Structure formats: C-alpha cells, structure tokens
Amino acid sequence: MTDAFAEASAAIARGDRDPFHYVVLAWYRAQAGERDAAYQLLQQALTIAPDDPVALTTIASLYREDRRLRDAVLHCDAAIRACPTYAAAWLERGFVLSSGGSFALAVESYSEAARLDPGNAAAWAGIAMIAGRNGDAEAVRMPAAKALAIDPDNLIASAALATVEIEAGEYAPVVARLSPLLAAKAPPSSERANALNVLGDAYDRLGRTDEAFATYTAAKSEFAAVHAPQFPPEREDHRGFIDRIGRSLDGADARGWALAQAGPVPGAADSHVFLLGYPRSGTTLVENILASLPGVSALEERPTLREADEAFLGDDAGFARLAGLSPAEADPFRAAYWAKVAAAGLDVAGGTFVDMDPLKGLRLPLISRLFPQAQVLIMRRDPRDIVWSCFHTNFAMTSTSYEFTSLERTARHYDAMMRLTELSLERLPLNTHVVRYDALVREFDATTRALCDFLGLPWSVELHNFNRTAAARGVSTASAAQVRKSLYDGTRQWERYAKQLEPVLPILAPWIERFGFD
C-alpha cells in the first residue's frame, strides 16, 4: 500500500469529502484490476462534486479502456466545460478520439493539450503518432522532437518517427532507434506493443523474417497482456459470438425472410451497398475506389446496425424476434440505421451509399431481413495472406483484434467467420457479387468494370485515382498506408512466412481450396 493510497483511505475514513481522495483510491483500484470498485469510487466523487474535472477525466479514462468511447468523450467534454484550461482533459479527449479512429479531431485535442501544457510529452507524441500514421514525415518531426526532448524514452514519438522512416525505405535506422528502447525491462503496455510492431515491420523489410516473426509475436503478447482483464473466462469472446449467430441461422427457416418496407424512411439512399469480407481482405481499397465516383458516398467501419444488433443478436432468442418482425416493426430499425449514417455527416439521399465493414458478414441475417434490396459485395483474398496480415498488423483494441493475438487464434476466427458468411449466402436471399483481391490488383479495369456493372454505376478512369480519394477523405482503418499509394499488390506475402504458418494450414486448407487459392 502506497502512502497516497493510505492517506486517501484515512481521509475518507475520517469523513473528508474532498473528491480527490476518491479519485486517488479509484486509480489504485483500477490498477489492481478492481474496475467495478474504481467506477463506484469515481461516481462517489462526482456525487460530491459533479463538475470536478479530475474525476470526470479519470472516469473518461476508464471508459476508454473499456471501449465505452461515447461515454468517455462525453465525460471529457464535461471536464472541459468545467475547466477549459485543464490540459489533462484535452489529452484524454485526444486518446479517446484516436482510439475511435477520429484522428483529425484527436489532433485538435492533442494540440490544445500541448498549448496548455507545453511540457506534456504525451500530447506532442499523440500529434506525432497521427502524423506518422498519415505518412506525413514533415508533420512528424517537430512534435516528435518536442516529445523526445521532454521524455527521451517516449515510445510513441519514437515509433512515429520510425513509421515514416519505414515508408521512406529507411529500415536500419528503425532497428537502431527502437531496439535499445524495447530492450529495457518494462511492464506490458500499448506503447510497447505498438513499437514492437513497428520494429517487426523494419525486420520484415530487411528480409530478417525470423526476427520479424519473433518481434510480431512479442507485440501480440504485450497486446494480449494489456487487454486480458477485459476478457474474463465467463465473457463471450468474438469467435463465440460468431458461432452463436451461426447456430441461430442454421436453425432458422429463412424462406420468405426478406421484408417489405412499410413506408418511406427519411434519409435513405437510392442505392444501398454493403461491402464486407474480413479484415485485411481489401475492403478499404474497394471502398475508396467506389468513393472516387460522383454520387457515391461511403462510410468506414461504423456500427450502423447497433439498434438491430442489440435487439436481435444479443441472445439466443433474438432470431425468433427477427423472424417474427412485421414491416411496420422493422421500419424503426431502418430509420435508426439511416440516422446513424446522417449523424456521420453524410447526405446520401438520391445517391449510392457504401457501408464498408469487413465484419458485417456477421450481420447478413439483419441485412437480408431489413434491407432486402441492398447489394452485397464480398471481398475474397488468399486466406494465408489474410491471416498473416491480421496477425502482424497493429490494430486498435476491439473484441475482434483481441482474436489476432496468435496465429492459431487468428486462423480459427477466420474459419468461424467464413463458415458463418458461407452459411448466410446459402440460406438467405441476398444479391451478392464477389470481388477477388488478386484479380483487382492485377486486372484493375476488368474487375472494376464488372463491379460497376453489378452496382449499376458508370465506370470511369477516375477509379484509378482512389489513392487521391483516400487522402482527401482520410482513412481510419489499418490499411491507411497501403491505400495512400497507387495500386498496391499485396498478394503472396505469406510465402516468406510459410514455415511459421505451417501449424495453421489445416485450419485454412478448406477455404484455400474452396476459394480457389490452392
């Protein structure tokens, strides 16, 4: 027990109602993994002082760690309203927005934190990290230098510099920069996991595949250790969720599944497209190709079906409720969907709307039931490339990315997702078109013409400028670096790691054969 913990405990015991004491105890409880106790203490602090910026910011941090990002940003905003000059609230807001993929807004918050507290290395490092993610070498250097001047061992700033060095083809300096920092013994952290991943990328580019694989494995181990408390054994993991949906669909009678629309839904697009497949299958590339056409709007990995998810996918009885839905009962879920699209800043009425989410294959029963006129694009890529890419890519924390912490776990998740997707295609009335990644990168014009024909869109040479579209729109997925380039052929990357992939090939073999990649 530290002095601060003991002092706070004693102060509360003698009736001192200063909210700071509750915040101190909450922090220690959270560090000990006692999250419920931490939340209770912070709520007590906010009962005493509802506008206390320290308590509001601390609970926002817990919400962020638990992926309750909306609650987190709302509490940051409340802290800022209470004390606009409280730099820690702006910094936490940057963390939250960055976690949610809202990088432009995150930079604004980090910048305000740095303005208010120029000696805050984390604020400068956050700015550098996002600039590095955007591939902007010039924008990385100043904030990274400021962060490292304050904290020479700052892994976020060092990894940001390393990221742009890799994009510039400078791999050896990355090894020299990151290896000494990562050699120091330290508890697992998200910062170490990210830096290890960047170091693995440098080894990969240098052709040092054994070292790359070992470093990627270490990165995933750190990632798993940091986030393991969020996944106690009694919690359904993402693969379990997929399997449960599959069992429900397998037992359902999907004849006459498509529902008519009871009435017009405000804000609906004239043409509605779902683009799905699996992470790292090429969905971001196709999204930006289509968004290069006039009249096409696209949205990237947003929970547009959240209300329907909660109503129909939350328990085993959900499918019965979905099957018994009348058109009038379905329309509020459709309206909620289009309201989500509008809330993202898109006006899609009169045009084509592309809802890109590689994991919306999970929602094909909902899509078929609620949006029977929608067109569904399914990305296909060599399963070995997908699994290898998911394993070595540094994703933001989600229940899905937690499945990518080992090659075997990644392969089993992919297998579960493909089984559910294929079952959905067999059982449900869906209007689908398959886009093969290998065909897209090797026969771009022919593949995109077929894609446009399916969607009823005019083909244009502007499709070749998808990288400009991506730069203008911004990309929040892990594919940002690839789609900033001109057409990038990522096929057969798995071959250099064939030895490491051998143990999972029996899991992937049926899909390699079924999809024609043998």
Where are these regions (language model features)?
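Secondary-structure boundary/capping positions in well-ordered alpha/beta enzyme cores
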Residues: D52, Y86, V296-S297, Q373-Q375, ...
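PAPS-dependent sulfotransferases, especially Golgi type II membrane carbohydrate sulfotransferases
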Residues: P143, A172-L182, A186, A193-G267, ...
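Short beta-strand segments
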Residues: L275-G277, N288, E300, T352-D357, ...
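Conserved nucleotide-binding/hydrolysis micro-motifs of P-loop NTPases
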Residues: P303-T304, K360, R381-I386, L440-V441
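ATP-dependent adenylate-handling active sites, centered on carboxylate activation for C-N bond formation
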Residues: V348, M356-L359, S368, Q375-V376, ...
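Conserved phosphate-donor/acceptor-positioning beta-strand/loop module used by diverse small-molecule
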Residues: I367-C390
